[in-house]
C-alpha cells in the first residue's frame, strides 16, 4: 500500500504484461476472425444503406476491441448478437418463446467458445422470420402486403351475402293494369261527346257509358252521364293520373264545365312468373280456408289472402296474378308471402 502511494510508483503499460482483459480480447478477436459465417442481409447490396452503416458501427475494432460508435465495446466482449434488419425491428415484436430460444442459443455459444449457430448461417427471409414474430398492429405501417399476411395468420370465417327473406331478388311482380276513378262534377251529354270527340264509342243498348281511348298513355276511359269517369289500362300511378287529366281536358273543350276532383286508385293488377310448376291439388288441401280450386270452371286456383287483402290467381304453370291492391307495396308484400308457400308445393318434373 505504501508503494502505491509513493510518487515513484508507475502504472504498468497494457501492452507489456498479459492481463485477463487481453486474454478475453484475444478470444473475442478469434470469434470475429470469421465474419463470413455471420449472415448480414445488407451485405448482398453493394450500395451502403442505413442498415449496413449501423452494423459497421457496431462491429468491434481489431486492434483494441472498442467499437467505433461509442468506444466502450462492452457488449461485444461476451458474444456476438445476431443482427436483424431494422424494418423487422420496427414492424414486429419477438414473442416470449422466441426470446427464450434466443437466450438459450446465446448461452450455448458462450459455453462452447462463441461458435455461430447453424440457423444464423442460413439466409433468412421475411417469411421464415414470420413464424417467431407477433404482429404489432399499433406500430406497424399500413402496408398492403403485411395486412394480407395478418389475415392469413388470424382465424378466417366465411362471409355469406345477405339474402332476401322469402322471394328471389330476380323475381319481382310487374304492374299490368291500374284502375282509377275521378269526378268531373257536372252532367254530361253522352250523345254530344260521341259525335264530336275522336276515338269515342257509344251504344246505350249494349253499354251505358261512352268508351273513349287515347294512345299516350295507352288507356281507356268510361265516361258516365253523371259526371263520373273510370280510367283503366295504365302501367303506373303517374300514367293513370296523366291519362285522367287528358280525358277531362277533352270534355272541357266540348263545352262542359268539367272539373278534376277526387282521383282515387281503386285497383292494381300485378303479374309475376315464379318459374316452376305448382301442385294445385296439394295447395288447396293444405290451405282450404283461403283457396278454392274448381278446374271445371276455372283452370287456376283462387287464393284469398287476408293481410294484405289481395286475391291471387294461381295457374299450374306458375304465372301468378295479384289483384285488389290499392298501393303498390301491397302487391310486393302479398307476393313475398305467397312465394314462400308456393316453394313447398313445387311440382317435381
Swiss-Prot record:
* Repeat positions for sequence: 175-251, 265-342
Q: Which positions are tagged coiled coil?
A: none
Q: Which PROSITE patterns match?
A: TFIID
Localization annotation: Nucleus
Q: Name the HAMAP family on file.
A: TATA_bind_prot_arch (MF_00408)
Function of the protein: General transcription factor that functions at the core of the DNA-binding multiprotein factor TFIID. Binding of TFIID to the TATA box is the initial transcriptional step of the pre-initiation complex (PIC), playing a role in the activation of eukaryotic genes transcribed by RNA polymerase II.
Q: What is this protein called?
A: TATA-box-binding protein
Origin organism of this chain? Drosophila virilis (Fruit fly)
- Lineage of origin: Eukaryota, Metazoa, Ecdysozoa, Arthropoda, Hexapoda
Amino acid at each position: 500500500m505504501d508503494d502505491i502511494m509513493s510518487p515513484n510508483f508507475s502504472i504498468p503499460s497494457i501492452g507489456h504484461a498479459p492481463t485477463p482483459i487481453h486474454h478475453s480480447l484475444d478470444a473475442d478477436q478469434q470469434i470475429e476472425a470469421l465474419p463470413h459465417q455471420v449472415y448480414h442481409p445488407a451485405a448482398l447490396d453493394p450500395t451502403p444503406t442505413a442498415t449496413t452503416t449501423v452494423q459497421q458501427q457496431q462491429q468491434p475494432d481489431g486492434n483494441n476491441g472498442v467499437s467505433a460508435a461509442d468506444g466502450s465495446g462492452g457488449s461485444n466482449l461476451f458474444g456476438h448478437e445476431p443482427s436483424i434488419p431494422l424494418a423487422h425491428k420496427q414492424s414486429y415484436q419477438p414473442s416470449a418463446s422466441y426470446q427464450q430460444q434466443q437466450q438459450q442459443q446465446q448461452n450455448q455459444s458462450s459455453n462452447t467458445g462463441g461458435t455461430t449457430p447453424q440457423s444464423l448461417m442460413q439466409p433468412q427471409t421475411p417469411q421464415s422470420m414470420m413464424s417467431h414474430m407477433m404482429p404489432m398492429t399499433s406500430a406497424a405501417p399500413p402496408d398492403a402486403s403485411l395486412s394480407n399476411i395478418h389475415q392469413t395468420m388470424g382465424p378466417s370465417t366465411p362471409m355469406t351475402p345477405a339474402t332476401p327473406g322469402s322471394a328471389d331478388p330476380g323475381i319481382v311482380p310487374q304492374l299490368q293494369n291500374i284502375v282509377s276513378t275521378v269526378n268531373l262534377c257536372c252532367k254530361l251529354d253522352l250523345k254530344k261527346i260521341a259525335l264530336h270527340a275522336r276515338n269515342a264509342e257509344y251504344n246505350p243498348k249494349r253499354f251505358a257509358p261512352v268508351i273513349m281511348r287515347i294512345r299516350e298513355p295507352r288507356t281507356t276511359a268510361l265516361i258516365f252521364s253523371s259526371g263520373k269517369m273510370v280510367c283503366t289500362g295504365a302501367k303506373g300511378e303517374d300514367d293513370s293520373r296523366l291519362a285522367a287529366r287528358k280525358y277531362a281536358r277533352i270534355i272541357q273543350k266540348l263545352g262542359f264545365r268539367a272539373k278534376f276532383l277526387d282521383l282515387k286508385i281503386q285497383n292494381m293488377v300485378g303479374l309475376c312468373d315464379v318459374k316452376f310448376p305448382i301442385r294445385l291439388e296439394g295447395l288447396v288441401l293444405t290451405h282450404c280456408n283461403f283457396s278454392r280450386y274448381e278446374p271445371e270452371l276455372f283452370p287456376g286456383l283462387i287464393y284469398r289472402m287476408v293481410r294484405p287483402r289481395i286475391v291471387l290467381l294461381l295457374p299450374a304453370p306458375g304465372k301468378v296474378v295479384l289483384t285488389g291492391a290499392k298501393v303498390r307495396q301491397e302487391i310486393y308484400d302479398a307476393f313475398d308471402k305467397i312465394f314462400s308457400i308456393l316453394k313447398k308445393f313445387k311440382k317435381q318434373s
